[in-house]
Regions:
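Conserved Rossmann-fold NAD(P)-dependent oxidoreductase catalytic core, especially the SDR/UDP-sugar
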Residues: 89-129
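N-terminal Rossmann NAD(P)H-binding glycine-rich loop of SDR-like oxidoreductase domains
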Residues: 3-22
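NAD(P)H-binding glycine-rich loop region in Rossmannoid oxidoreductase-like domains
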Residues: 35, 40-87, 91
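Mid/C-terminal beta-alpha module of Rossmann-like enzyme folds, strongest
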Residues: 2, 204-252
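A conserved pocket-lining segment of Rossmann-fold NAD(P)-dependent short-chain dehydrogenase/reductase
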Residues: 170-193
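Conserved beta-loop-beta element that borders a ligand/cofactor-binding pocket
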Residues: 140-163
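C-terminal amphipathic/interface module of NAD(P)-dependent oxidoreductases
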Residues: 239-240, 256-277
């Protein structure tokens, strides 16, 4: 397949490029012109910017967007996060206005779900907090592409755990925190399984049967971890954990990602036969 990855220079994007490279032709879009010449991709990967002529492709994986954990979540930052994602969708509609690819995968988040003691599948109820509203706007932007006669996957990612970025990188130079009352369940997925799950959707699309022109897919491990268990997974070498009151996570909206409490199940991936590593 010919696959375009937007946001391919990021934490997840680089892992996905490496995973697809041996069996697919990969194109990477980056909106940062300063990054274009510094990407260390193999010569077989074509890097595109907004000024490029976009090649015909079979599928797009949209990972593009400003990182949530970059700085404090002010009102302007939240607007910037949303706009950065919707801008890429708008650009893709312009570039492929006459021949849109048949598969479009939009990176989303499990933060859309309401806290629950029950197991949540892709049909889970939505929360009403600002994260859920943010995710809903992004998903609606992707679903607008249904008018282009393409199939849309909404990939709802849990916290992605990998050594090269995300929560592991943020904790790298800090002692491992241990939160009092940190027994809330956090959906998570390893970076390796994240990339493999995207690859699985691309390669198994023709084998799946659907009753609608889009599919929600939970990207999270099938086992559940509490907040403190997740932090231990992220810093297994840390022998000492520093007790912390949970209220400090409420001081910044980014901390709300670790305050959720829901057991999200990757029902679609499991049903289709995906094997977690």
């Amino acid at each position: 397949m010919r696959v375009l990855i937007t946001g391919g220079s990021g934490f997840i994007g680089r892992a996905l490029v490496s995973t697809l490279l041996n069996s697919h032709q990969v194109f990477v879009y980056t909106h940062k012109s300063s990054v274009e010449n510094n990407l260390s991709f193999p010569h077989t990967v074509t890097v595109l910017t907004a000024d490029s002529d976009f090649p015909k492709v079979d599928a797009i994986v949209n990972l593009s967007g400003e990182a949530i954990d970059k700085s404090f979540l002010t009102r302007n930052r939240i607007a910037s996060i949303i706009n950065s994602r919707l801008h890429t969708i708008k650009l893709l509609k312009q570039k492929y206005q006459n021949d849109f690819p048949k598969i479009f995968i939009q990176a989303s988040a499990t933060g859309i779900y309401k806290d629950s003691n029950e197991e949540l599948t892709e049909n889970g109820s939505f929360n009403n907090n600002f994260y859920a509203k943010l995710v809903t706007q992004i998903e609606n932007g992707a679903l607008a592409l249904l008018s282009k006669d393409c199939f849309v996957y909404l990939a709802r990612l849990g916290v992605v755990v990998g050594n090269s970025g995300g929560i592991v990188k943020n904790l790298k130079y800090l002692p491992r925190p241990y939160f009092l009352m940190g027994n809330n369940y956090i959906p998570y997925i390893t970076l390796e399984d994240t990339a493999l799950a995207f690859k699985f959707l691309l390669e198994h699309h023709s084998l799946c049967s659907f009753d609608k022109p889009y599919q929600i897919v939970n990207f999270c491990q099938e086992n559940y971890l509490t907040l403190n268990e997740l932090l231990k997974l992220c810093k297994p070498q840390s022998k000492v954990a520093i007790p912390c009151p949970k209220f400090i996570l409420r001081l910044d909206k980014r901390g709300h990602l670790l305050l959720v409490d829901h057991k999200v199940k990757p029902a679609f991936l499991l049903k289709q036969g995906f094997k977690f590593s």
